[in-house]
């Protein structure tokens, strides 16, 4: 064993232990491939049996021999890098050519234009580089004084360094692509270039990170701002030179110095990256009339930015430009303040302005009913309200939902006018606190606002409030109904809940009062029975273990137990009527009485189960087999688990299957004749009623009333007699009806039948 393992582990060219086959293969392979050593080949030979496959793999290069891992030499590395750089430069050049083309068009088109663009944009606090004047001095936008100084210095340097600065960019870029462009070594150029490229990428990332923080009036403006703040001098100067001097663009002389070549296109790279975006903005900005479109675009931007502060900042400038157009409320001064201030103070001011705007809006909505004409005269504010209006309604509805109860108490006839100011004030408060709401509101500007809008708004608010009140009242009514229903019908809830509900709601009908106690107990047993999954939902469902213990007999919450009966449910105080058990009054009553109103009121079972009370298939609940047993066997089957009285299966007296009847027959008859609407539900009543009929019975028989113990014994005796009589009587019915072999025949509380399953 050790030899084998050694053999497999140590084939290192000494083929002494290798068997002759492998030796032969190795020799042929070394002849074919003289540069392969045995060490290289031996693993292959072990892996593939067939010589041909090995040869095939080696020749096709699928298999290579072990070799030293070498670092590529410096020359190789440089060559590779040069190739990469050249490719990169070609791509860049194509890009730049396109960009410069656009750029020249832009500059020629727009710098000749009126300087009003510069003022409005500067007013908005965007540090766009198009707000610079042609001579290279900058209107101080967004606090960029230091920046502009830097850029001017760099421009001067460039002008000193080169005879004609904005030489034809396209040609410069092309000439740079030629490797034989001058004295400098290509390696130096390439390395410096790659560094530049990395810087550019980093700065782009920086921009993207900054973009959500800075307030995005227009996407391009902020990107340019970011680039100017974050870039080193080279790129800033590039943007400056590319924009500031459009006049000399026409004169194009190719610059000769190699250094000029290296710097020039590199500088352009930033302009190339940043240029296409400003182009779009310029087109937008040139049409100040198209305020609606601008607003839409700005709102889209607002959706993109995540920070709510940015959203606020972004919404203000639009209204500011409109204000400037109509110089209405002297917000112009505010705006220019903002520009010199830092961004934080911008946001604070804008919040304040929003507050002002909303207060104005409130005043307007209050003035509205008196004078719609005023509103039209306030030209600019229309747009503000347009932006606010819908959000206001939203907020109102929100608040109404949160303050439902207050509204109910405060105003039963809701005329929204007196209330509205306070609500809008609340709305203002919530808006300042909650930036996200602000964002949602900005996304729905409506541009043309009819003067009547606030009236509509008020009407709508009134409508909302009325709706809310109606809903609340309905809910309360519904609750009351539910509770009554729960009390008069099924106790699906836990007993604690039930009692709470009873306390809360005065029962309207005396019937509910009567059944209240019964219900508490019913709830308890129902909760107990919920343990079996389907018992309450599906009346026909049974399974073998179901009837083992008295408390889980099918559908059996023992109806109106007598105090004398000890059972599992004595703890609940009162027994309760349940799905299939019929209140005592009907124990001996004819089956016709089954469907009378009394059963409906007395049993707490939900409506859908009630028709089942008249036991549908001849008293059996075998859901699927019922017809077989009933139709095909018209005779009764002997019932083996029965407790002695009668060997066939028999329903207990008058369909009341599971409850042993502890009353005298006299009592049964009387109670059947008693008012069917009255079913005893409380224990005190039970005791009285129970003792009354028995006493009457005895008095009729001319006997003395007995003391309780005797009475109990006599009741028990009578009960047995009655049961036997009932069993005998029912045997005939059973023979006709063909009762199923099953559950209904026994007394579940008696010991004798206990072990049947």
Curated annotation (Swiss-Prot):
PROSITE patterns: CUE (PS51140). Recruits the ubiquitination machinery to RNA polymerase II for polyubiquitination, removal and degradation, when the transcription-coupled repair (TCR) factor RAD26 fails to efficiently displace stalled RNA polymerase II. Also involved in telomere length regulation. Binds DNA. GO terms for cellular component: chromosome, telomeric region; cytoplasm; nucleus. CDD domains: CUE_DEF1_like (cd14368). It comes from Zygosaccharomyces rouxii (strain ATCC 2623 / CBS 732 / NBRC 1130 / NCYC 568 / NRRL Y-229). Its main location: cytoplasm. Ubiquitinated. Belongs to the DEF1 family. It is found in: Cytoplasm; Nucleus; Chromosome, Telomere. Residues 1-18, 371-384, 416-427, 490-504 have a biased composition (Polar residues). Disulfide bonds: none annotated. InterPro entries: CUE, DEF1_CUE. GO terms for molecular function: DNA binding; ubiquitin binding. The keyword DNA-binding applies. Residues 21-63 form the CUE domain. One of its GO terms (biological process) is DNA repair. This is RNA polymerase II degradation factor 1. Homodimer; may form higher order oligomers. Interacts with the large RNA polymerase II subunit RPO21; the interaction is direct and serves to bridge RPO21 to the Elongin complex in a manner dependent on transcription stress. Interacts with RAD26.
